[in-house]
Swiss-Prot record:
The lineage of its organism: Eukaryota, Metazoa, Chordata, Craniata, Vertebrata. Pfam families: DUF2465. GO terms for molecular function: protein methyltransferase activity. Residues 485-501 have a biased composition (Low complexity). The gene is Fam98a. Positively stimulates PRMT1-induced protein arginine methylation. Involved in skeletal homeostasis. Positively regulates lysosome peripheral distribution and ruffled border formation in osteoclasts. Residues 382-395, 457-481 have a biased composition (Gly residues). One of its GO terms (cellular component) is tRNA-splicing ligase complex. It comes from the Eukaryota. This is Protein FAM98A. Residues 502-515 have a biased composition (Polar residues).
């Protein structure tokens, strides 16, 4: 298996290197390496590889091909000297009996692999090396081209002292004499009629090289497709027995195919006007020769598979559509209620709907709910039954927070009173009153219509009542244990529960201080 792989690699490399010998045939290489140094064909292949190496490398040793198996020992000695000069890294080729090294098939394949790799490396180094200066007279390639022109025209060898102008003048004269002997339209008019300078020829050469590289890639692709297609024919069991016959037919034709083209600027100069004729491929005369029966076969009706952009439904959205947030039920903004009142089983005030006021204090011994909430503005007059704390804007009158016995006066109000008392006025003061363990204190200060108050007091222990309902927009506060301020300036304190004054368990009326 290993020998087969080595044989395949060697054959491909030999084709790339340009070898044209008989060992490219199917099975020929394997037969030659089986005999080793006794095979003249094997020695010829080795001699060809060494000769190509000597062109690129400075080698003293040389290898000559043999004509008979009797010259095998001499060939092996020459190969041994060459490998020693090249510092071959394979011990099986440089050690052991010299006359028996190349009689083994594996060693022969290894020798070919080594020589091929060295030749490929030498050619790559030569390509990458800087070009040498051309010899005087245009170099050997130009000399060979000019020599071919002289031979084709039947010219004699030019003298050694002839100039280039004289040489090309002689070629032009000979061409005119030759063209005069042929019919007028035998050659045709040239396709390129304009004269070109050195800069133009350089650009044309660059264009030709770019096109040549492109078509080389295309040729390699087509050749590889051809190789794969032919190889696929041998996969069936029936074709495996015909592999040798297929190779004998295919390999000669395959070797002719070259990936590199031979088109040069000379072909451009030789192009004639007949190449520029445009032929219609759909004309009646042309289709008479190109028509075939398969063009007349019509396909049957096939089902419509759809897929048109205008018929495709849009995909469902990844996110649900945005919806406007629905507002909740409209409620009137209410404030926090007043404090706890007196001995009541129900709350009269509750939260005010549109009334904005201060907070009430905590009452004393009461079973009722919380007092009224925030109120709105009170327009005009004093407030009858005012709560613990008054707020908002009062256009007239004098409004003073009442006094709740046994309650907690915790709110504060800061309203603006358009009228009222000017200057400094000390309103009624209730302080230090013991209301069933409660403490009430009311600090009041009024200056020029600005009414500010702050009350604090701790009422007695009592059960919490429920919250009162929402109050209406108009009207005063429902007061539990509220206080009224009479016009005469007299301050009275009582529980508003049917006008009944309640005193129980140490709860009593507080002392009144009037200024």
């Amino acid at each position: 298996m290993e020998c087969d792989l080595m044989e395949t690699d060697i054959l491909e490399s030999l084709e790339d290197l340009g070898y044209k010998g008989p060992l490219l045939d199917d099975g020929a290489l394997l037969q030659a390496v089986s005999a080793g140094a006794a095979s003249p064909e094997f020695t010829k292949l080795c001699a060809w590889l060494v000769s190509e190496l000597r062109v690129l490398c400075k080698l003293e040793e040389n290898v000559q091909a043999t004509n008979s198996p009797s010259e095998a020992e001499e060939f092996q000695l020459e190969v041994s000297g060459l490998l020693g000069e090249m510092n071959c890294p394979y011990p099986c080729l440089t050690s052991g009996d010299v006359t028996k090294r190349l009689l083994v098939q594996k060693n022969c394949l290894l020798l070919l692999t080594y020589l091929i790799s060295e030749l490929e490396a030498a050619r790559m180094l030569c390509v990458n090396a800087p070009p040498k200066k051309a010899q005087e007279g245009g170099g050997s390639e130009v000399f060979q081209e000019l020599k071919g022109i002289c031979i084709a025209l039947g010219m004699s060898k030019p003298p050694a002292n002839i100039t280039m102008f004289q040489f090309f003048s002689g070629i032009e004269k000979k061409l005119k004499e030759t063209l005069a002997k042929v019919p007028p339209n035998h050659v045709g008019k040239p396709l390129l009629k304009k004269s070109m300078g050195p800069a133009h020829w350089e650009k044309i050469e660059a264009i030709n090289q770019a096109i040549a590289n492109e078509y080389e890639v295309r040729r390699k692709l087509l050749i590889k497709r051809l190789d794969v297609t032919v190889q696929s024919f041998g996969w069936s069991d029936r074709a495996k027995s015909q592999t040798e016959k297929l190779a004998k037919v295919y390999q000669p034709k395959r070797s002719v195919l070259s990936p590199k083209g031979n088109i040069s600027i000379a072909h451009l100069l030789a192009a004639r006007q007949d190449l520029s004729k445009i032929l219609r491929t759909s004309s009646g005369s042309i289709r008479e020769k190109t028509a075939c029966a398969i063009n007349k076969v019509l396909m049957g009706r096939v089902p419509d598979r759809g897929g048109r952009p205008n018929e495709i439904e849009p995909p469902p959205p990844e996110m649900p559509p945005w919806q406007k947030r629905q507002d909740g039920p409209q409620q009137q903004a209410g404030g926090r209620g007043g404090g706890r009142g007196g001995y009541e089983h129900s709350s009269y005030g509750g939260r005010g709907g549109h009334e904005q006021g201060g907070r009430g204090g905590r009452g004393g011994y009461d079973h009722g709910g919380r007092g009224g909430g925030r109120g709105n503005k009170h327009q005009g007059g004093w407030t009858d039954g005012g709560s613990a704390s008054g707020g908002g804007y009062q256009d007239g009158g004098y409004r003073d927070p009442g006094f709740q016995p046994g309650g907690y006066h915790g709110g504060h109000s800061s309203g603006y009173q358009g009228g009222g008392y000017g200057g400094f006025q000390t309103s009624s003061y209730t302080g230090s009153g013991y209301q069933g363990g409660g403490y009430q204190q009311d600090n009041r200060y009024q200056d020029g219509g600005h009414h500010g108050e702050r009350g604090s007091g701790r009422g007695g222990r009592g059960g919490r009542g429920g919250r009162g309902g929402r109050g209406s927009q108009g009207g005063g506060w429902g007061g539990r244990g509220s206080q009224t301020y009479h016009q005469g300036g007299q301050f009275e304190q009582h529980f508003q529960h049917g006008g009944y004054q309640y005193s129980h368990s140490g709860f009593g009326q507080g002392r009144h201080y009037t200024s």
